[in-house]
Amino acid sequence: FDSYGFTKRTTLANYGYIKEFLDSKVKRTMIRSRLGVLKNHVPNSSLAELNWHRDEIICQNIRINIPITTSPEYMFEMEGNDVYHLELGKAYTWDTNIAHRVLLTNPAPIDRVHFVLGFSPWFDYDENNQCWESNEFWGKHPFQMLVDGDVFSGLEILKAE
């Protein structure tokens, strides 16, 4: 992964509501983030189910997943866990180093669009010196940083049942 190679927002992220949202909510240095679109494919096809994958450990990249458009046919599955529907109006995070995937259970009426934000929990980018430096949160568990509002403001933390 080269998440730390991404040190600047794209042009799109500096306009309109996206800029307003990021400026008002984000408290840590953003790294590899995206607006992910999963087209409505045929269920159980190789295109409908993203392959199982792992991302960086949470101490390197803590992610927040915000559904923009979705429907109940799009499900999220983590290795060793149940299958979940990520609902609109909520933000989600998990240990992305545990294998996970998105799957489509039936034809969906719309495409799935999620805002996936990655944050560096323990390092901040110094634009002037063009380097990463450890910050005041060094060693604090990234999930506790979320609970304490150190990463992203306005999150209500709910425990999965």
Annotated model-derived regions:
Residues P67-L88:
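A short beta-strand-loop-beta hairpin characteristic of the jelly-roll/cupin
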Residues N40, I57, T69-E73, Y92, ...:
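Short, solvent-exposed loop/turn segments at secondary-structure junctions
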